[in-house]
Amino acid sequence: MSQVSLVVMGAGESSRFRQGLSIKKQWLRLGETPLWKHVALHLSKQACFDQVIITASPKEVKYMQKQVDFEVIEGGGTRQESLQNALASVKTPWVLVSDVARFDVPSEVISRVIGRLGEAECVAPAIGVSDTVSYQGEYLSRSEVKLIQTPQLSHVESLLLAFRQGDFTDESSAIAKSGGRVLLVEGSERLKKLTHPHELTLLQGFEPPFGGCYGGSGFDVHAFMEGEGLRLAGVNIPAPVTFKAHSDGDVAIHALIDALLGAAGAGDIGEWFPDSDLAYKGVDSTLLLQEVIKFIRGIGFELINADLTIMAQAPKLSPYKEAMERRLGEVMEVSRQRISVKATTTESLGFVGRKEGVAVSAQVVLKLLDWTKHACFNR
């Protein structure tokens, strides 16, 4: 059995990166492969690891697990909390920790780091600086200044003890603070960290995102009961009935959510918002749609088109179609031109024809965000 496990940090919210883009950096695609998966697969082949663990944000755990055979662990609010969650599952005495942001890890760096196993509580790659360095008015010797990189190899027990001392940005600083020995080995200029949108140029030479489209469909029905009106596509419709439902019963948005999740391969509305959860009792479905579209964008998709067909014998919906398109555009933050809402009857056939309820069919088309088209990449 190997003495080392691998942990890939992929749970971050990419707050600095997303100041210019909607996507989280770990979901940038190389072809159809997200960056976190590219990093995990590459690193996993560089040594004989006993375990490979990937940290993920809570809403992405199941989605990431679907794409790999490695163990995916829910991360925390900070990098350190995420790593501590992962360490709880590590069974080996040593762990190699790497960040998705450093996506181009040379094999020789991994060999240098792991090759010094046992010589210190932490082994980390580092590079020197070529610029003159000043700190609080004092000029420092460049030979004494090092930029610490990842991946870093740490003794698990020592690292867990070190984390009790406070919050740290990496393993080496935690172990050094606790009095442990940190050994620095030669790093690489290729280990530059992707943090801001202007650093997309670091991806030059890598495969651009897959340019095809992803289609999804959704279908939902709700029965009527006595009430004071319906809500469809976020628009209030006067009627002597309302929907029997756990939420507000917006059958149009529910079908649309299923279509979005289907196109992304991310489950269905029942998995995301179960009707057994009291938190969704009477909830405004536009809030659910906002959550889903934020997720869809965060994992790297853009909405190209959404097409809804509402089947209702009554009430008459044609006067409200434009308002529905506008409202869906507002909620999803897209142009109304990308949304089509159609209304039809069933010629008095079936439960819809008997005016017992409404059915909605929705289709969407998504595509991957193309980072090669971003202004920051083409500077």
From Swiss-Prot:
Site positions (Transition state stabilizer): 16, 25, 246, 345
Cofactor section: a divalent metal cation
E.C. code: 2.7.7.60, 4.6.1.12
Origin: domain of life: Bacteria
Keywords: Isoprene biosynthesis, Lyase, Metal-binding, Multifunctional enzyme, Nucleotidyltransferase, Transferase
Keyword match Transmembrane: no
GO biological process terms, semicolon-separated: isopentenyl diphosphate biosynthetic process, methylerythritol 4-phosphate pathway; terpenoid biosynthetic process
Xref: InterPro entries: IspD/F, IspD/TarI, ISPD_synthase_CS, MECDP_synthase, MECDP_synthase_CS, MECDP_synthase_sf, Nucleotide-diphossugar_trans
Annotated site residues (Positions MEP for the nucleophilic attack) in this chain: 142, 193
Span list, region 2-C-methyl-D-erythritol 4-phosphate cytidylyltransferase: 1-213
Pathway: Isoprenoid biosynthesis; isopentenyl diphosphate biosynthesis via DXP pathway; isopentenyl diphosphate from 1-deoxy-D-xylulose 5-phosphate: step 2/6; Isoprenoid biosynthesis; isopentenyl diphosphate biosynthesis via DXP pathway; isopentenyl diphosphate from 1-deoxy-D-xylulose 5-phosphate: step 4/6
A GO molecular function held by the record: 2-C-methyl-D-erythritol 4-phosphate cytidylyltransferase activity
PANTHER family named in the record: 2-C-METHYL-D-ERYTHRITOL 2,4-CYCLODIPHOSPHATE SYNTHASE, CHLOROPLASTIC
Role, per record: Bifunctional enzyme that catalyzes the formation of 4-diphosphocytidyl-2-C-methyl-D-erythritol from CTP and 2-C-methyl-D-erythritol 4-phosphate (MEP) (IspD), and catalyzes the conversion of 4-diphosphocytidyl-2-C-methyl-D-erythritol 2-phosphate (CDP-ME2P) to 2-C-methyl-D-erythritol 2,4-cyclodiphosphate (ME-CPP) with a corresponding release of cytidine 5-monophosphate (CMP) (IspF).
Name listed for the protein in its UniProt record: Bifunctional enzyme IspD/IspF
Organism: Wolinella succinogenes (strain ATCC 29543 / DSM 1740 / CCUG 13145 / JCM 31913 / LMG 7466 / NCTC 11488 / FDC 602W) (Vibrio succinogenes)
Source lineage: Bacteria, Pseudomonadati, Campylobacterota, Epsilonproteobacteria, Campylobacterales
Gene of this entry: ispDF
